[in-house]
Design a protein with these regions (language model features):
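Surface-exposed extracellular loop regions of Gram-negative outer-membrane beta-barrel proteins
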Residues: 205-227, 327-329, 372-378, 419-432, ...
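Outer membrane beta-barrel strand-and-loop segments of large Gram-negative receptors
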Residues: 403-405, 451, 535-537, 541, ...
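A short, solvent-exposed loop/turn motif at the edges and junctions
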Residues: 45-50, 72-87
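Short, acidic Ser/Thr/Gly-rich low-complexity loop/linker segments typical of extracellular
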Residues: 48-62
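Outer-membrane beta-barrel translocator domains and adjoining extracellular loop/strand segments
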Residues: 264-279, 323-340, 355, 381-390, ...
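Short, ordered, surface-exposed loop/turn motifs in non-cytosolic proteins
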Residues: 33-46, 70
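Membrane-proximal, glycine/serine-rich, low-complexity loop/turn segments characteristic
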Residues: 22, 34, 60-62, 83-85, ...
Length: 760
C-alpha cells in the first residue's frame, strides 16, 4: 500500500497520465537440466495460427516481446540440437513462461553455436555476457571486468570504472547510479551491457557511459550478505541487502559498514623555497602515524515498473568518520643545521541524508518523458592541527551543505531511427561554513548552473548525424566577493559512419564550460606548516573547453575487438594550482590565468582466445601543454593487460600495468607510478562465492614519487603506503525465497559533498 501511495505521489509530480495499449509475453527457454538455451528462435502466433512476430532469446535463454492485446497465443520455439516445441501461453504483464526443450536424436556432433558477445548497435557497443562469465562472476563489477570491453579500466576492489582521459558514468536500466552501487547487482540478473564510447541521447554530456540492462522479476525476494577482509592491514567491508517484490512494485533495503585502520604513509620529502630575501632548503622524514576511517550507510528503494512507466523513490543516509589521520616526523632545515619534530593531525565527520525521485513515462509509442529530482543535506565537521617546536595551530570547521538537482527530457522518435529531444536541467548548491580557532571566518557560498538543449538525430543510410545546440547559465557568489554570472552557448555534434556491420568511425565535436569546485572557490585558508599555507580563491572565472574526438571500432569475427581512440582538448581559463611568496610564507592557491591543450591516443584489443581464455591489452599516450602564469609540458605512455582463465567452477584472473606518470589538472604535481600487478582465484557454486586475491605481493616498498617545480618552490616526495600491497579474502551468499528475484543494487552515493578548504 505504501509503495502505491508513493508511486501515486510521484505520478502527480510528473503530471502525465500514461496510456495503455500493448502487453508483454516473456519467458525463459531451458533444457532438461533447467539451463538456459541461448539464441533460440521464438515465433508468436494468434490462436487462429496468424503470424504475429518473431524474436530471439538472449545468451541465457530469456526472451520478451510485446503483442497487441492480452489473451492466449501460440509459441513455436526452435533451437539447433533440440526438438521444436509448441506451447500455448497467456499474454499479460505479470506472468513469465518457462519452456523446456528436449534434445533430438539427430543432433549434429561437434557443432557449437556461438553468439557474438560484442556487437555494434547504432551509436553504442552491445555486450551480451556468455555462460562462462555468468558462471564465474558474482556482482556487477566482476561482470564488467570479465567482459573486457575495449578502452575501459575496471577496478573491482575500489569500485571504479574509468577510460583513458575521463571517468565513465554508470546507469542501470537508464537510471544514473554511482560507481560503488553496481557492486550489489548480481551478475546473473544482467541481460546485457550497453557501452556508449561517444555518448548520445540521454547520455550526452558524459565522457563515456555504461547502461546495464537487467531482467525484470515480479515475485519473491532475497537476503544477500557479502564481506571483504584485507589481511595485510586492517580493512573490512561488509554489506547486507533484503528485497521483496510484489507485482510491479519492489522494496529493497541496504545496509553496510566499512572500517579502515592502517599505519600512515612513509614519507621522505626534499624542499627548496626561493624567497626574495631568503633561500631555504629542508628535508622531512616521517617515522610513525596512523589513519582510521569508518563508514556506515542505509538505504531504502521503492521501484514500480509498468508497461508504460517506471517510478523510483530512494532515501539514503551515509555517515563517514575519520577519527584520526596523524603523521609524526622530523624536519631538517638548511642542510640539517637544525631539526624539528612535527605532528600533523586531521579529523573529519560527515552525515548526509539524500532523497531521489525518478520517473520515465511513455506518453505514446513514439513519445516519452523523463524526470529526475534529488536533494541532499550534509552536516560536516573538519579539524586541522599542526604542531612543532615553534608553531601550534588548530582550526575547526563546521559546515551545512545543501544541494538540489533537476533534470527533464521530452523525446520524440521518428521513422528510420531519427529522433528529436528537448533537455532542461538545473544544479543548485548552498553552503555555510564556520571556521574557528587559529583561523576564524564565516563563509557563505551559493551557485547554480541551468542548461537547455535541443538534440536531433538524422540517419542517412550508413551515416548518422547528431546535432545538440543549447545554452547554459552559470552563477556563483561567495560572501564579500563579487557575484559571477556567465551565459554561453554550447554545441555538441557527432558524425557516425558505419561502412560495415563490424566497423564504425565517429567524429565528435564539443564546446562547453564549467565552473570551479566549491572547495576552491572561497576565502578560507589552512596552515600546513610553519612555511606553507593553503588558500582559496573567490575570484575564479568559468572555464571554457573545446574538444574533438575520433573513434574507430572494428570487430574481427566473434573473437577480436579493436578500438582506436584519439582525443584533442583545448581549455581557456584552465584552473591550475599556483604558488607564490607572501610575508616569507609559501601560499598555495588556485589560478585561472592559464590555457591548456592536450592530446590522448589509445589503442585497445580484446581477444576471446577460447571459451576459457580471455585477454585484453590497452596502450595509451598522453601529451599536455599548459601556458600562461604557469608553463609546463607533460608526456607519458602506459600499458595495461588483463588475462582471465576459467576452469570448471574456478576463475583465475591476473592483471598488470607498466610504470608511468600522471598529472591531473588542476594539480601540477607529477606523480611517478610504479609497476602494478595482481591476481585472484574465485570459486562460484550455486548461491555461494569465495575469492582470494593479492595486489603487488612482491613489492613491500612500492614507491610513488611526486615532483613539483615552480619558480618559487621545488619539491620531491617519496611515498610508501602500507596499503599498496594487498592480500584479501571475499565471500558472498544469497538466500532466495519465493520465485527468484532480480538482485537489486546499492543505489547510494557514498561521496559526501563539502565546500570546506582542507589542508590535505
Amino acid at each position: 500500500m505504501k509503495g502505491k501511495i508513493v508511486s501515486f505521489i510521484l505520478l502527480a509530480f510528473i503530471s502525465v497520465t500514461p496510456a495503455y495499449g500493448q502487453t508483454t509475453i516473456k519467458g525463459t527457454i531451458v533444457d532438461s537440466l533447467q539451463v538456459g538455451i541461448p539464441y533460440a528462435a521464438v515465433k508468436v502466433l494468434k490462436m487462429d495460427s496468424t503470424f504475429v512476430k518473431g524474436v530471439a532469446a538472449d545468451s541465457i535463454g530469456c526472451f520478451q516481446t510485446s503483442v497487441p492485446q492480452e489473451g492466449k497465443y501460440i509459441l513455436i520455439v526452435n533451437s539447433l540440437g533440440y526438438d521444436s516445441k509448441v506451447q500455448i501461453v497467456e499474454a499479460n504483464n505479470a506472468s513469465s513462461s518457462v519452456i523446456t526443450l528436449t534434445p533430438n536424436s539427430i543432433a549434429l556432433h561437434d557443432v557449437v553455436v556461438r553468439g557474438s558477445s560484442i556487437t555494434r548497435k547504432d551509436t553504442h557497443l552491445q555486450i551480451i555476457p556468455d555462460k562462462q562469465i555468468y558462471k564465474h562472476t558474482n556482482n556487477g563489477y566482476d561482470l564488467l571486468y570479465d567482459l573486457m570491453i575495449p578502452n575501459l579500466q575496471i577496478d573491482r576492489q575500489k569500485g571504479a570504472v574509468t577510460t583513458i582521459g575521463g571517468t565513465v558514468t554508470l546507469y542501470i536500466d537508464g537510471r544514473k547510479v554511482e560507481y560503488r552501487e553496481v557492486k550489489g547487482l548480481k551478475s546473473k540478473d544482467i541481460l546485457k551491457v550497453e557501452y556508449y564510447d561517444v555518448p548520445t541521447g540521454k547520455y550526452a554530456g558524459d565522457y563515456a557511459s555504461i547502461n546495464i540492462i537487467t531482467r525484470p522479476m515480479t515475485t519473491g525476494g532475497y537476503i544477500s550478505v557479502d564481506g571483504t577482509q584485507q589481511l595485510a592491514y586492517q580493512e573490512g567491508d561488509y554489506n547486507l541487502a533484503a528485497k521483496v517484490a510484489h507485482g510491479s512494485t519492489s522494496f529493497t533495503i541496504f545496509g553496510g559498514y566499512n572500517r579502515l585502520h592502517y599505519d600512515a604513509d612513509k614519507i621522505e620529502r626534499e624542499e627548496f623555497f626561493h624567497f626574495d630575501n631568503n633561500e631555504i632548503s629542508r628535508s622531512y622524514s616521517s617515522y610513525e602515524g596512523v589513519n582510521k576511517q569508518n563508514q556506515e550507510y542505509v538505504q531504502l528503494n521503492i521501484l514500480t515498473k509498468k508497461k508504460k512507466y517506471m517510478l523510483s523513490e530512494k532515501l539514503s543516509l551515509v555517515r563517514k568518520e575519520n577519527p584520526i589521520n596523524q603523521t609524526n616526523g622530523i624536519l631538517f632545515a638548511n642542510t640539517a643545521q637544525t631539526s624539528t619534530a612535527q605532528c600533523s593531525t586531521n579529523t573529519s565527520y560527515s552525515l548526509m541524508p539524500r532523497l531521489s525521485l525518478y520517473g520515465n513515462i511513455d506518453v505514446t509509442d513514439k513519445q516519452y518523458v523523463e524526470l529526475s529530482l534529488s536533494g541532499t543535506y550534509g552536516r560536516n565537521k573538519y579539524s586541522n592541527m599542526y604542531k612543532d617546536e615553534k608553531l601550534n595551530t588548530n582550526t575547526i570547521v563546521k559546515e551545512d551543505y545543501y544541494s538540489a538537482n533537476f533534470y527533464g527530457k521530452y523525446g520524440i522518435i521518428f521513422p528510420h531511427k531519427n529522433s528529436l529531444s528537448f533537455h532542461l536541467g538545473s544544479v543548485y548548491m548552498n553552503t555555510m561554513s564556520q571556521y574557528m580557532g587559529t583561523y576564524e571566518a564565516w563563509q557563505h557560498q551559493w551557485s547554480s548552473q541551468s542548461y537547455a538543449f535541443v538534440e536531433y538525430v538524422q540517419q542517412f543510410n550508413k551515416w548518422r548525424l547528431r546535432l545538440k545546440p543549447g545554452a547554459s547559465a552559470l552563477y556563483y557568489h561567495t560572501k564579500d566577493a563579487d557575484a559571477v554570472s556567465h551565459y554561453i552557448p554550447q554545441l555538441q555534434s557527432t558524425i557516425f559512419w558505419q561502412p560495415t556491420k563490424s566497423q564504425q568511425v565517429s567524429l565528435d565535436i564539443l564546446f562547453s564550460n564549467a565552473y570551479p569546485t566549491s572547495s576552491s572557490l572561497n576565502t578560507a585558508e589552512q596552515i600546513i606548516d610553519d612555511l606553507r599555507i593553503k588558500r582559496g580563491n573567490e575570484n575564479l572565472r568559468p572555464m571554457d573547453f573545446y574538444q574533438g574526438t575520433v573513434n574507430y571500432n572494428i570487430q574481427i569475427g566473434s573473437k577480436i575487438n579493436i578500438t582506436s581512440f584519439s582525443n584533442f582538448v583545448y581549455q581557456h581559463h584552465q584552473y591550475v594550482q599556483t604558488y607564490y611568496e607572501e610575508n616569507d610564507k609559501l601560499i598555495n592557491s588556485m589560478d585561472d590565468h592559464n590555457n591548456s591543450r592536450g592530446f590522448i591516443e589509445m589503442l585497445s584489443l580484446s581477444w576471446k582466445a577460447t571459451d576459457n581464455l580471455r585477454l585484453k591489452i590497452d596502450g595509451v599516450y598522453n601529451h599536455t601543454d599548459v601556458w600562461g602564469k604557469f608553463r609546463t609540458t607533460f608526456n607519458f605512455w602506459r600499458a595495461y593487460m588483463n588475462v582471465n582463465y576459467y576452469c570448471n567452477e574456478f576463475a583465475f584472473r591476473i592483471w598488470a600495468n607498466t610504470k608511468g606518470k600522471e598529472m591531473i589538472l588542476p594539480m601540477i604535481t607529477v606523480e611517478h607510478v610504479p609497476v602494478n600487478y595482481g591476481g585472484s582465484i574465485n570459486w562460484n557454486h550455486k548461491d555461494w562465492s569465495f575469492e582470494v586475491g593479492t595486489v603487488s605481493p612482491f613489492h613491500k616498498n612500492n614507491e610513488f614519487i611526486e615532483t613539483l617545480n615552480v619558480p618559487v618552490y621545488n619539491s620531491q616526495e617519496h611515498i610508501i603506503s602500507s596499503t599498496n600491497r594487498k592480500f584479501y579474502i571475499q565471500a558472498a551468499y544469497t538466500f532466495n525465497f519465493g520465485k527468484k528475484t532480480q538482485k537489486d543494487w546499492k543505489n547510494i552515493d557514498m561521496n559526501v559533498n563539502s565546500a570546506i578548504l582542507k589542508a590535505k
